[in-house]
Amino acid sequence: MYQRDGNHTMITIKFDEKGLVPVIAQDKTTKDVLMLAYANKEAVDLTRSTGYAHYYSRSRNKLWKKGEESGHLQKVHEILVDCDEDAVIYLVDQLTAACHTGYRSCFYRRLDGTVSGERMFDPDEVYKKSE
Amino acid sequence: MYQRDGNHTMITIKFDEKGLVPVIAQDKTTKDVLMLAYANKEAVDLTRSTGYAHYYSRSRNKLWKKGEESGHLQKVHEILVDCDEDAVIYLVDQLTAACHTGYRSCFYRRLDGTVSGERMFDPDEVYKKSE
């Protein structure tokens, strides 16, 4: 996954003051943008070492393996970095859907509220409520 | 560009504590992710009213029309919002290239430093140094 030919230097990602970098998850095949999330260094390192997308949840303040609850894992084929080295793309194979709402992509609505995305599952079936 | 059919409600974007929202500029045709930048409310409003991508520069602390210096404008066809309403996609027609380095996309390198993108112009020719 990370071939080195000796002529290139690993890019050092610039994490922000909270230690995070925004990550765009993009479907490797359809090129749809699936989600925007954040990663800390540990999440990027785990993504590289395991080949599966890891993020850092800002609301739960914890490292997060995408799909750990739903099973909707993201297999990461490549990591791209932008010119400023402060934003990242994970090029992924997405199992089922990226969004917890059941849509394939989190970006399933236009600004006017109309729906442009495709729903892949019923979240009530996937994220079981505790009884 | 923003048809309303009466059954949908305009989404209210959640700007962060700095008044910004991350914006992914995606090529409408190739679906390449071109750049990740930030917008404040004024930038989103101007994008909607003019049809051209506007952002807010965090380094220069000012509103910024993409291409105002280089001429590499982004005509915005659609604005998508994510499930949490705190991230946005501009679906654009990109003139020439998005990146100030001359590459079509700002995400022209892999994490290992190898180049995957295509260079479209020489930045020294486009961003003239003052003499």
Swiss-Prot record, chains A, B:
Q: What is its main location?
A: cytoplasm
Query: What is catalyzed by this enzyme?
Result: 1-(5-phospho-beta-D-ribosyl)-5'-AMP + H2O = 1-(5-phospho-beta-D-ribosyl)-5-[(5-phospho-beta-D-ribosylamino)methylideneamino]imidazole-4-carboxamide
Q: What class of enzyme is it?
A: hydrolase
Please provide the Gene Ontology terms (biological process) for this protein. L-histidine biosynthetic process
Protein name listed in UniProt: Phosphoribosyl-AMP cyclohydrolase
Where does the protein end up? Cytoplasm
Instruction: Specify the superkingdom.
Output: Archaea
For binding Zn(2+), which residues are annotated in this chain's numbering? Answer: 83, 99, 106
Q: Which HAMAP family match?
A: HisI
Write down any Gene Ontology CC term.
cytoplasm
The yes or no answer to whether the keyword Ion transport is present is no
> In the Enzyme Commission scheme, what number(s) does this protein have?
3.5.4.19
| Entry keyword ATP-binding | no
Subunit structure of this chain's protein: Homodimer.
Q: Where does Mg(2+) bind?
A: 82, 84, 86
Q: Which cofactors is this protein said to need? A: Mg(2+); Zn(2+)
Pathway assignment: Amino-acid biosynthesis; L-histidine biosynthesis; L-histidine from 5-phospho-alpha-D-ribose 1-diphosphate: step 3/9
Q: Which family does it belong to?
A: Belongs to the PRA-CH family.
